[in-house]
Amino acid sequence: MALLDDDDISTALALLPGWGIEDGMLVKEYVFPEGFMAAIAFVDRVAVAAEDADHHPDIDIRWNRVRIAVVTHDEGGITGKDTGLAAECDRLAVA
């Protein structure tokens, strides 16, 4: 899959509220007011989606906060795989 250029990334970010770029990766922090178990349930849903897509994000869990970072390592940057997984994470956060 081809790397996205800066314009493509800006367009994608406009459709992905709360996502940003950090160290060349798409990054977002989700907060679950319900607490730790809600955060873990979200991570479980993301894990299934990531495995199905064969595209695995970096995940950091801090009690009720989950930080997701995605990048296509094989391509050396952000691709459509990353924006697709970011959108899926947003969908799963409200599931």
Positions of the model-derived regions?
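Short acidic N-proximal helix/loop "leader" segments that mark the beginning
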Residues: 1-23
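Short, well-ordered beta-strand elements within core beta-sheets of diverse protein domains
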Residues: 26-33
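Solvent-exposed alpha-helix faces
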Residues: 44-45, 87
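C-terminal structural segments of small proteins and small subunits
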Residues: 67-92
